[in-house]
């Protein structure tokens, strides 16, 4: 059954710890626990702390100025939305995209060609040897992705977009197929799996797959030694040209693209559309082909490096150390395991912008624990200076299964048999942030989740309002004490709860 979003009265699950001073600054307190979401109360700052101070907010410091929340426009999301009535679709699109809605998303990610939540494999040009791109087209996009975007634009005409491919056209790859590795979900011959490591090791390691296995703290456990994109200049230039063709084609559809990333997750060796790249191949393509081509044909479009889903810092540093490449780069994009190296990379290159290019999508559980994880991810990425945060699927049917056999979570879950929908715990986790943090909001202070499982983020809106996002992901109550100026925010947080405190 659909979970309604109407505010309801505060029911006593959360306890204020100190008497409220008559002249104290008042805050709205929004809290959520499993089965009892979006409770509202009021709380005021105090003159004294009632516990150990968790975080001291220095209003003269700033981590980053936030820009945008985003989501990805995938075919399976459009199919899920299509299960519902027009009124239900309108409710969802309003809540997700409208400036007056719940999540207020202003940014869209588009896959250039198929990704793992496409209906099936496709690219914009599967005509082998078409180096002039005469047969390049976005016909498949016109079936679902573009109608999906237009439906969102109805609620926010100012949406902007960025692109990244999962795989080049199959004929541009060394084995002539869209996946990296064989599986029962594709037709690639297992005999070609050895290409990933060339003559090193002989066989692929099943634990390299994101879907399964232990990785001993490293992802990937073994880096690919082979570029799956053919490294011949003619192929590389044609591929760079295809990015510009895609930008042009979407512009004709009234969809502005202002940022490009050369590859999604070059370090996931996948049975679905993917492409492994070495550090040398990544540098070569971005520095010698994609960067110069964008600068010449689309100087208004920024080039970011990513999407980095590896925690191998030495590998990332090797790529970004290239001085000629740096001349083309405006920022970096991190997701999944890449979150681990974000803080140190940002410290090395404070001149670049940073984004979370994909929120982690779980395994189809759609449970409260998944909501807590997403809450912590937003704390981590914003607290470590990301200006944008992009979600993956925002709506899926049933168990969220991909055509390539794995399950993922979404912000909204559709029951395809009953033709009903539910706002999931992750939806509310996102609302605790996105409803209050918009463009121009300054991220001021941050405390990571840590052993106490109590992540805290403090921001200041363009109107000068303080907003605090905090979670308690322990099995017991925890106290919260923040120092803001000369006063204190004191509260008791219920077990496994999410909170937003907004200055009134």
Segments (PLM) and residue ranges:
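Solvent-exposed loop/turn segments at secondary-structure junctions
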Residues: 74-79, 114-117, 167-171, 264-269, ...
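Conserved, mostly hydrophobic/aromatic
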Residues: 71, 104, 161, 260, ...
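Aromatic/acidic polysaccharide-binding cleft in carbohydrate-active enzymes
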Residues: 353-429, 445-448
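Active-site neighborhood of glycoside hydrolase catalytic domains
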Residues: 237-365
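Carbohydrate-binding surface patches
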Residues: 447-485, 492, 496
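N-terminal catalytic cores of secreted or lumenal carbohydrate-active enzymes
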Residues: 34-257
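Bacterial Sec-dependent N-terminal signal peptides
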Residues: 1-26
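Alpha-helical scaffolding within the catalytic cores
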Residues: 49-59, 147, 245, 288-289, ...
């Amino acid at each position: 059954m659909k979970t309604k979003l109407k505010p309801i009265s505060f029911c006593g699950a959360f306890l204020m710890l100190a008497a409220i001073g008559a002249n104290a600054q008042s805050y709205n307190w929004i809290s959520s626990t499993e089965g009892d979401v979006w409770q509202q109360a009021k709380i005021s700052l105090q003159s004294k702390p009632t516990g150990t101070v968790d975080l001291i907010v220095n209003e003269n410091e700033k981590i980053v100025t936030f820009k945008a929340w985003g989501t990805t426009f995938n075919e399976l999301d459009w199919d899920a939305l299509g299960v519902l009535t027009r009124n239900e679709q309108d409710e969802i699109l309003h809540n997700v995209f409208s400036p007056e809605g719940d999540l207020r998303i202003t940014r869209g990610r588009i896959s250039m060609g198929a990704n793992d939540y496409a209906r099936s494999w496709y690219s914009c040009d599967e005509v082998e040897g078409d180096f002039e791109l005469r047969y390049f087209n976005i016909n498949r996009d016109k079936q679902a992705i573009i109608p999906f975007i237009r439906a969102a634009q109805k609620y926010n005409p100012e949406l902007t977009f960025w692109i990244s491919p999962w795989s080049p056209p199959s004929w541009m790859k060394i084995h002539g197929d869209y996946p990296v590795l064989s599986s029962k979900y594709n037709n690639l011959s297992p005999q070609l799996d050895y290409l990933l490591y060339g003559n090193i090791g002989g066989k692929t390691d099943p634990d390299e797959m994101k879907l399964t296995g232990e990785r001993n703290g490293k992802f990937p456990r073994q880096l690919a030694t082979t570029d799956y994109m053919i490294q011949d200049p003619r192929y590389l230039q044609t591929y760079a040209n295809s990015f510009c063709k895609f930008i042009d084609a979407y512009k004709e559809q009234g969809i502005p693209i202002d940022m490009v990333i050369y590859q999604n997750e070059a370090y996931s060796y996948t049975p679905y559309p993917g492409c492994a790249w070495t550090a040398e191949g990544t540098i070569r393509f971005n520095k010698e082909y994609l960067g110069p081509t964008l600068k010449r044909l689309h100087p208004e479009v920024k080039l970011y490096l990513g999407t980095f889903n590896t925690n191998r810092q030495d590998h990332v540093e090797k790529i970004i150390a290239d001085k000629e490449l740096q001349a083309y780069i405006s920022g970096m994009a991190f997701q999944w395991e890449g979150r681990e190296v974000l803080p140190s990379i940002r410290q090395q290159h404070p001149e670049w912008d940073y984004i979370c290019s994909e929120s982690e999508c779980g395994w189809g559980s759609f449970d409260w624990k998944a909501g807590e994880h997403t809450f912590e991810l937003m704390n981590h990425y914003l607290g470590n200076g990301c200006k944008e945060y992009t979600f993956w699927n925002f709506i899926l049917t049933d168990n969220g299964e991909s055509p390539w056999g794995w399950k993922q979570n979404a912000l909204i879950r559709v029951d395809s048999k009953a033709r009903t929908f539910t706002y999931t715990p992750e939806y509310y986790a996102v609302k605790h942030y996105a409803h209050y943090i918009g463009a121009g909001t300054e991220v001021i202070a941050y405390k990571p989740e840590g052993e106490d499982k109590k992540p805290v983020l403090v921001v200041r809106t363009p109107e000068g309002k303080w907003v605090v996002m905090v979670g308690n992901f322990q099995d017991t109550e925890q106290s919260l004490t923040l120092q803001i100026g000369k006063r204190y925010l004191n509260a008791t947080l219920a077990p496994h709860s999410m909170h937003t405190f907004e200055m009134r």
